[in-house]
Design a protein with these regions (language model features):
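Structural signature of alpha-solenoid helical repeat junctions
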Residues: 52, 72, 95-103, 133, ...
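Boundary/linker segments of alpha-helical solenoid repeat arrays
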Residues: 49-51, 84-92, 130-141
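Helix-turn-helix repeat elements of alpha-solenoid scaffolds
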Residues: 26-40, 70-88
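TPR/TPR-like (Sel1-like) alpha-helical repeat modules
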Residues: 75-85, 117-135
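TPR/TPR-like alpha-solenoid repeats
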Residues: 63, 111, 131, 144-148
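Amphipathic alpha-helical repeat scaffolds of TPR domains
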Residues: 10-24, 48-68, 78-81, 85, ...
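Solenoid-like repeat scaffolds
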Residues: 6-9, 42-49, 129-131
Length: 148
């Protein structure tokens, strides 16, 4: 009797690498193609690791901003940022590098501003500053101070 082959189990890093590579390829077709790829990934991957979900939602927020879907962008950015602890737990040595490339802060601030939710934009500026992501978030916060 033939031995049943074991299912292929990928590491979180391998799953993340596959997601990023697939997204890069899809993004050549524009933000709509990137969104289609990411939506299919969520539909077909029933159990993406939460750390990978952080990056997937971050990529989705960026594509939604490019497409002008501000409500979707704000929601995706919030979801991505909600998974940051999972990202840090899965990639403790790469977390700062991954965080530096995260678009969710920038795109979330943009989305909240476009939607007229300046308090939401301010909160994201404060959160980015607390994580030490750069002085430009302090400048953004200062430009939104009037909304307090």
């Amino acid at each position: 009797m033939a031995k049943r082959s074991e299912p292929i189990r990928k590491s979180v890093k391998e799953i993340l690498d596959d997601l990023v590579a697939g997204h890069q390829e899809a993004a050549y077709g524009g933000p709509e193609a990137a969104l289609k790829y990411l939506r299919r990934t969520f539909e077909n991957q029933g159990s993406l690791p939460n750390a990978v979900k952080a990056v997937a939602h971050d990529l989705m927020a960026d594509a939604q901003a490019q497409a002008g879907d501000w409500e979707g962008c704000a929601a995706s950015a919030a979801t991505a940022l909600g998974h940051l602890p999972d990202l840090e737990a899965a990639f403790p040595h790469e977390y700062r590098r991954l965080l530096a490339g995260f678009a969710s802060f920038e795109r979330g601030i943009q989305a909240h501003s476009e939607l007229g939710d300046f308090h939401g934009a301010l909160e994201l500026c404060e959160r980015a500053m607390a994580l030490g992501l750069g002085a430009h978030y302090e400048a953004k916060r200062d430009s939104l101070e009037w909304a307090r």
